[in-house]
């Protein structure tokens, strides 16, 4: 009795691990920034700079960047912003990791707390979780039919599978100029911003993958007037890559 098999290529995780980083640091307000009176909004994100791979472990370098929107202290209260970065140097142990393996890393800021020590110093507390895993390409032999036996009952079931055509990483850098709508004041200083890709559509074409979507831009800015008026601009622009 012989099995007729078909080889399927698949990506599997050889090993994975989770590492949690705790931050509890003091941060001095830069000299160019006004004194902090009252905090309005905060956010943070992680930047992965470099990953050094050795036997059984990966050393991750990067930083936790935090942003703060606040009201300045003093007689003339203004809406201001500041940004800071705390370094990341974390070693993650991964069983079976070798020099030629590909390590994938995702991050999550589980908690970010900024508290006011005084008008020129902030306390920064945060918890960052790093998820790391090793991907490898392996072959799976799937039996398709049996030959050589006539008295063997066979039950068949159809499954839809996808084939890995190519695996690569590419970085899309979008650089566009957005015009402030008429009726809005001129921009003097950007205080807060958010970017979000919406309605992303990926399509396979001859020799390439096409992506289309919308880039949502939120911008909170000051016009530089003495009253420090705040205005919001929310244009949406289409993007297309291949």
What are these regions (language model features)?
Residues 160-196:
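Edge strands and adjacent loops of beta-rich recognition modules
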Residues 230-242:
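Single conserved hydrophobic/aromatic residue that forms the stacking wall/gate
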Residues 137-170:
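Surface-exposed beta-loop interaction hotspot
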Residues 1-39:
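N-terminal alpha-helical "arm" segments
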Residues 23, 29-41, 99-105, 180-195:
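Intrinsic, low-complexity N-terminal interaction/targeting segments
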Residues 14-17, 33-40, 50-61, 115-122, ...:
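Short, solvent-exposed beta-strand/turn "edge" segments of beta-rich domains on protein surfaces
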Residues 104-149:
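Hydrophobic, ordered structural segments
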């Amino acid at each position: 009795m012989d099995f007729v098999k078909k080889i399927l290529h698949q990506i599997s995780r050889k090993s994975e691990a989770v590492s949690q980083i705790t931050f509890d640091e003091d941060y001095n307000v830069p000299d160019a920034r006004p004194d902090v009176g009252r905090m309005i909004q905060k956010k943070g994100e992680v930047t992965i700079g470099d990953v050094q791979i050795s036997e059984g472990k990966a050393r991750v370098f990067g930083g936790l960047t935090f942003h703060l929107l606040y009201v300045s202290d003093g007689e003339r209260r203004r809406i201001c912003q500041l940004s800071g970065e705390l370094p990341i140097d974390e070693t993650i142990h991964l069983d079976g990791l070798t020099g030629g393996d590909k390590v994938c890393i995702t991050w999550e800021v589980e908690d970010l707390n900024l508290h006011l020590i005084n008008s020129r110093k902030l306390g920064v507390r945060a918890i960052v979780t790093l998820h790391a895993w090793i991907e490898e390409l392996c072959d799976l032999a799937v039996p398709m039919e049996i030959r050589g036996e006539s008295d063997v009952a066979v039950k068949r079931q159809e499954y839809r599978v996808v084939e890995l055509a190519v695996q690569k990483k590419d970085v899309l850098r979008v650089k566009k100029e957005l015009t402030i709508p008429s009726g809005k004041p001129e921009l003097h200083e950007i205080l807060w911003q958010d970017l979000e890709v919406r309605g992303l559509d990926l399509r396979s074409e001859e020799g390439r993958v096409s992506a289309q979507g919308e880039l949502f831009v939120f911008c909170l800015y000051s016009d530089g007037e003495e009253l420090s008026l705040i205005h919001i601009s929310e244009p949406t622009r289409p993007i297309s890559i291949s």
